[in-house]
């Protein structure tokens, strides 16, 4: 009986080959982060999230700079981090944005859609802290672009 207890205690206290405690890899991604962020894409957490009466026509060119995805508006000589509709995806291999309805947009693509300009505190209220934290890291000025939360809210400029 004592031998069995010793074996169980030894197995429970198992360490790596150098005697250090075993490190079990875990993910620091929270459920909110998984819903709100995909690579550089910040998005509404779900399709039922309200986007209010965002009616301003926004246009510009997509630009990736590090982990930040921007809408560059040359007419204003500014760029803005973007909040996309829920279910928008980042295709890392091709470095493209894929909208919920399947439209693929590459970096350098001229895009347009309905939305508005918002402060980072508004991003937190609309889509949560994870997206707000990324937006804060990406700010060049004091605002972000938030598109309507509908699958067809933004697409290539026609």
Map each language-model feature to its residues:
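C-terminal motif of bacterial Sec signal peptides marking the signal peptidase cleavage site
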Residues: 7-11
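Short, surface-exposed binding/anchoring microloops in extracellular/periplasmic proteins
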Residues: 40-79
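Short peripheral tails and domain-boundary helices/loops at the edges of structured domains
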Residues: 128-158
């Amino acid at each position: 009986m004592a031998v069995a207890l010793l074996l169980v205690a030894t197995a429970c206290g198992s360490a790596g080959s150098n005697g250090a405690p075993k490190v079990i890899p875990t993910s620091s991604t929270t459920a909110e982060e998984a819903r709100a962020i995909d690579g550089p894409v910040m998005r509404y957490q779900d399709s039922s999230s309200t986007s209010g009466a965002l009616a301003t026509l926004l246009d510009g060119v997509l630009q990736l700079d590090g982990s930040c995805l921007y809408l560059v508006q040359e007419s204003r000589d500014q760029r803005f981090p973007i909040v996309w509709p829920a279910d928008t995806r980042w295709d890392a291999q091709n470095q493209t944005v894929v909208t919920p309805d399947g439209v693929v947009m590459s970096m350098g693509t001229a895009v347009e859609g309905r939305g508005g300009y918002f402060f980072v505190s508004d991003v937190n209220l609309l889509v949560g802290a994870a997206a707000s934290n990324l937006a804060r890291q990406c700010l060049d000025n004091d605002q972000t672009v938030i598109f309507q939360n509908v699958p067809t809210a933004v697409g290539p400029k026609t």
